[in-house]
Structure formats: structure tokens, C-alpha cells
Amino acid sequence: MVKLRLKRYGRKKRPFYRVIAIDSRCRRDGKALKELGFYDPIAGKTQLDVPNIIFYLKAGAQTSETVGNLLQKAKVFNQLSLLN
């Protein structure tokens, strides 16, 4: 099963995350199928590749809790429901 979740980058005490599509059996920082955006919690910046995220969600991908919250804030689920 494919999951949309965060992959940690950055240095100690200064995290930076990429939103990725990955096989659910892989480790957190394993090889991603596709990188779909980034999230910087310190600066409060988020950039998402919405068309590719919608593609993976339509294909049955599950989201982690944090990525689900990010997608709700970016109103991706609203766009997905309008397409259905």
C-alpha cells in the first residue's frame, strides 16, 4: 500500500520535511516513489504538488495524520471532492 507521509531532512533542532509517496512497509527515510512537496514547521512554509497528490489519493494512497492535516489546511480534500 502507498502512503503519503513526511521524510525528515535538516539538521539537529532544525527539521525540514518533504511530503513523499512511499510504500508503507519502507522506513521513514527510505527511497520515495515520488516527492510531492515540502513542509518547514519553523518558517511555517508549505509547498505541495496538488495534481500529483490528487493522483495518488485517487489511486488509493493513505495519508499519515500529519500529512492529512497539511492537506486539509491546503484544501486539497475539497478539490478532490469537487473532482469526484
From Swiss-Prot:
Keywords assigned by UniProt, alphabetized: Chloroplast, Plastid, Ribonucleoprotein, Ribosomal protein
Principal location: plastid
SUPFAM superfamilies reported for this sequence: Ribosomal protein S16
Record has Ribosomal protein as a keyword: yes
UniProt KW Transmembrane helix keyword: no
Molecular function GO labels: structural constituent of ribosome
GO terms for biological process, alphabetical: mitochondrial translation
Localization per record: Plastid, Chloroplast
Any GO CC annotation of this UniProt entry: chloroplast
Entry-linked InterPro entries: Ribosomal_bS16, Ribosomal_bS16_CS, Ribosomal_bS16_dom_sf
Protein family (similarity comment): Belongs to the bacterial ribosomal protein bS16 family.
PANTHER family in UniProt: 30S RIBOSOMAL PROTEIN S16, SMALL RIBOSOMAL SUBUNIT PROTEIN BS16M
The protein's name: Small ribosomal subunit protein bS16c
Organism whose genome encodes this protein: Mesostigma viride (Green alga)
Lineage: Eukaryota, Viridiplantae, Streptophyta, Mesostigmatophyceae, Mesostigmatales
